[in-house]
Amino acid sequence: MDFDINNLMQQAQAMQEKMKKMQDEAANAEVVGESGAGLVKVTMNGRHDVKGVDIDPSLMSEDKELLEDLLAAAVNDAVRRIEKQQQDSMQNMAGGFPFPPGFKP
């Protein structure tokens, strides 16, 4: 089996271009994290910027601590969703690149 360095370089360049595109898409992707069965929702982008918070009006009569807990849980849910989305995207991209034998992405 011959090792073609030129082919490998072309594939690396193509992968670099895919990576840049994926990073741009990931930064612009948005997810909604939820808590309290959807009573608190947090919208977050791929840069982990919180773009919006939606709190059901029924929670306004609840105590401050409950609302704080639900808000923290919704933010954490959004972070997990963004990270999962980015991880899945990376795995899909890496699946198209021929890694050398014994190397796992």
From Swiss-Prot:
It comes from the Bacteria. One of its GO terms (molecular function) is DNA binding. It is found in: Cytoplasm, Nucleoid. Keywords: Cytoplasm, DNA-binding. Its main location: cytoplasm. GO terms for cellular component: bacterial nucleoid; cytosol. InterPro entries: YbaB-like_sf (IPR036894), YbaB/EbfC (IPR004401). Residues 85-105 are annotated as: Disordered. HAMAP family: DNA_YbaB_EbfC. Binds to DNA and alters its conformation. May be involved in regulation of gene expression, nucleoid organization and DNA protection. Homodimer. Belongs to the YbaB/EbfC family. PANTHER family: NUCLEOID-ASSOCIATED PROTEIN YBAB. This is Nucleoid-associated protein ABO_1774. It comes from Alcanivorax borkumensis (strain ATCC 700651 / DSM 11573 / NCIMB 13689 / SK2).
